[in-house]
């Protein structure tokens, strides 16, 4: 089963952040001059020939081969980031079922996911292996999901576990974009010298999905202001 948490389906507001105020310690952020930014998580290699002339594309490269990535570049995709989930396990990914004993709790509204203890060395090793595989495929960066595990489980071991994983990614020479993760990112930027994060993507800035009614809603002013201030 493919990943069903598809960003386009939920009509997320996607905000690519290259702000010096937020990421002042970064060198070069994701596609500093990117005008066409496309997120296609949930798609597979069947879309390869349908895409062209994109500055920054986010895909789940687990479903793409090295040749697919090369073909995307031939089609004019200038930067390619891969989705990677570091903070939860997903039942449709075969390797994640091996880590059930490290789960922390249910992931609200996503029954196929559970929060994972990112401080577990076994999980960190698994994530490193996934990172290596994505690097071999030729991606330019990582679109890192579920650092929000620190919001749900605000323990130093969880925070440090995220740092360990991001540090491994950073040493590959690829760029790192955090999806959401405001609680983690705010702490990181106030307590560390930023050498890891190149950008932030935030969902649900202006709208949100109401799971109970299966509909979309407009965020209230305070929510909009919180996210825009964060970004």
Question: What are the functions of these language-model segments?
Answer:
Residues 3-13:
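Bacterial N-terminal signal peptides that target proteins for export
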């Amino acid at each position: 089963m493919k990943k069903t948490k598809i960003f386009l389906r939920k009509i997320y507001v996607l905000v690519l952040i290259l702000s010096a105020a937020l990421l002042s310690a970064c060198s070069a952020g994701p596609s500093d001059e990117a005008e066409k930014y496309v997120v296609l998580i949930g798609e597979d290699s069947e879309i390869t020939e349908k895409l062209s002339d994109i500055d920054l594309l986010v895909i789940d490269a687990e479903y793409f081969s090295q040749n697919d990535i090369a073909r995307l570049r031939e089609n004019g995709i200038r930067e390619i980031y891969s989705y990677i989930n570091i903070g939860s396990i997903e039942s449709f990914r075969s390797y994640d079922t091996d880590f059930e004993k490290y789960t922390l709790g249910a992931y609200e509204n996503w029954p196929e996911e559970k929060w994972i203890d990112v401080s577990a060395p076994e999980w960190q090793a698994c994530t490193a292996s996934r990172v290596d595989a994505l690097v071999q495929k030729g991606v330019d960066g990582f679109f890192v999901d579920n650092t929000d595990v620190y919001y749900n489980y605000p323990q130093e071991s969880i925070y440090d576990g995220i740092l360990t994983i991001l540090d491994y990614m950073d040493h590959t020479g690829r760029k790192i974009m955090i999806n959401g993760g405001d609680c983690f990112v705010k702490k990181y930027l106030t307590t560390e010298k930023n050498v890891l994060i190149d950008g932030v993507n935030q969902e649900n800035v202006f709208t949100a999905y109401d799971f109970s009614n299966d509909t979309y809603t407009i965020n209230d002013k305070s929510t909009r202001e919180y996210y825009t201030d964060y970004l």
